[in-house]
Amino acid sequence: MMYAILILFHFFVEIQPSVETNPGYTVGDVATDFSLPNVDGKQVSLADYPAAKGFIVVFTCNTCPYSVAYEDRIIALDQQFKDQGFPVIAINPNDPAARAGEEMEKMQKRAQEKEFSFPYLQDVGQKIYPQYGATRTPHVFVLNKQDGKNTVAYIGAIDNSSRNAAEVTETYVADAVNALLKGQKPDVQETKAIGCSIKTL
């Protein structure tokens, strides 16, 4: 009985919304660049996209069921907005030593299986996700490029249905990017990220 209670408690903690204090970026902050290894073996940074109007930075992973549930929607966001100047940049923040299945080889396999149209980067040393303040996978930061600086315009969830894409009624990230493309601020600038905790030792 006690074992079952512990399992249920662990499951609840794993998936509950991110409510802890965010030590990273807030809306309006300027995000610093990074250089991280991609699944294709190359290093990728935001500076590699000089023509971009901004970025959809998604902290996601291989093993979280919420991240897996969002994969097709993340692909759709990239397909919808990449040619309009807002490409998706996916970053796996998990320490593979803390969670099996998050190794670069597994990331490469997953990217190939799902035919990711965007970079899938490994946060080696887990230095980038704390800068952003990501606490869950998935956790999204929409950046708007202004005067050569990447300003945070939206933080949080992709939409309002973490489990079922058919039940989405609020498309937070898409709405934010569409507003930025019109030269406007997003009506909704921050939501709670719902997903799995980031794994670290």
What are these regions (language model features)?
Residues 45-68, 177:
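Short active-site neighborhood of thiol/selenol oxidoreductases, capturing the structured segment around
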Residues 68-113, 124-131:
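Structural microenvironment flanking redox-active thiols in thiol-disulfide oxidoreductases
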